[in-house]
Amino acid sequence: MSKGTLFDKVWDLHTVATLPSGQTQLFIGLHLIHEVTSPQAFAMLKERGLKVLFPERTIATVDHIVPTDNQARPFADSLAEEMMQALETNCQEHGIRFYNIGSGSQGIVHVIAPELGLTQPGMTIACGDSHTSTHGAFGAIAFGIGTSQVRDVLASQTLSLSKLKVRKIEVNGSLQPGVYAKDVILHIIRTLGVKAGVGYAYEYAGTTFEQMSMEERMTVCNMAIEGGARCGYVNPDAVTFAYLKEREFAPQTDWDTAQQWWQSIASDPDAVYDDVVVFDAADIAPTVTWGITPGQGIAVDQPLPLPEQLPASEQAIAEEAYQYMDLIPGQKLLGTKIDVCFIGSCTNGRISDLRAAAEIAQGRRVVPGLKAFVVPGSERVKQQAEAEGLDQIFQAAGFEWREPGCSMCLAMNPDKLQGRQISASSSNRNFKGRQGSATGRTLLMSPAMVAAAAVTGEVTDVRELLGQ
């Protein structure tokens, strides 16, 4: 049993009661909502005659269904417009702060909360979205929840949860040029598997994470769920505090007091973990998924695995993946032709991601016939990118420059694959049909790797383009 970890400290501080079931009734400090998983929750409140208990602790935005090209209202998709109107009405009726399109702060929920300073160390955070684990980058305990749990948080500001074990994932050393945070988390998932984290919270530690920016840490924590973990986190440190300082919702008058408290909730040096796994950063290369789960990844310069050489539990899904993806065991992904390139999402739609991709795009051109587009994670990211001229770099290279939203990460808006198209994507999931076509294929990779694919027309080792 873990002891003295950040997870234990934050859990204990937010425990309201131990329920007869053995679960913990946990107070939720910050609740994030969007247009997809909240309408039914609000409807259930209305049926029971309930109000939102602490509306000031809930923040709303619209992201999943918004078009990224033409955002004029009403939306062309009537269902999307209906969901949009429902969120607007519910927020107005319950006094919930809503960052709507055109507010200057709208965007993907897991991008805007950190950039506003809403996400802070020691918090418990919930959202009706799988990738709520993103906020763990700040030393928060953040859970993705379902619609009925969204209702529970709105009504009571609590959740009934079973306490998780804690696995420490330690990565040490400096990353090689061309290797990014996305490669780190894909490497971890391919090594441990997509089910290894079930029942665990992942603590990401070691010198590699200490050297990362907050945006890089968010990329890693974002995909904790892809490794089976309910949440993932990094202990708060000077990097965390520097990011938060002077942000809109960060403490203003009692900064020193807040910083001292944040430091106190970090895992103790002698903390006891349920499990510890150690990686060497030198072993991590640019990584690309080849199959239909995020765990089916490979270093870009390595041959695809032979199913018979995989553990018995992975052989059937490997065979299924090869058939679906139309790839051959033993071959390399290098040179695989790409139809669509997508840079964005809550995993990789932040300013540092766009800078990394722009570095590759600058002075080059998207291959004719290939569709490539960049979707900033928020209106603030878009404004910053345009202030730096990144939009001009992308457009000069032949990329489309879009409005903020979840876009092609998932098939809930007009940005979708067609037929058997294969995409190079900076998003987080490569399931069958994830990007809108029942037969479409997705290769997950870093934004820089996506940009490299766009200007070469095929899976390319980004290290070959850096510095040229």
Swiss-Prot record:
Its cofactor is [4Fe-4S] cluster. Binds 1 [4Fe-4S] cluster per subunit. GO terms for biological process: L-leucine biosynthetic process. GO terms for molecular function: 3-isopropylmalate dehydratase activity; 4 iron, 4 sulfur cluster binding; metal ion binding. It catalyses: (2R,3S)-3-isopropylmalate = (2S)-2-isopropylmalate. Keywords: 4Fe-4S, Amino-acid biosynthesis, Branched-chain amino acid biosynthesis, Iron, Iron-sulfur, Leucine biosynthesis, Lyase, Metal-binding. Catalyzes the isomerization between 2-isopropylmalate and 3-isopropylmalate, via the formation of 2-isopropylmaleate. Belongs to the aconitase/IPM isomerase family. LeuC type 1 subfamily. Heterodimer of LeuC and LeuD. PANTHER family: 3-ISOPROPYLMALATE DEHYDRATASE (PTHR43822:SF9), HOMOACONITASE, MITOCHONDRIAL-RELATED (PTHR43822). This is 3-isopropylmalate dehydratase large subunit.
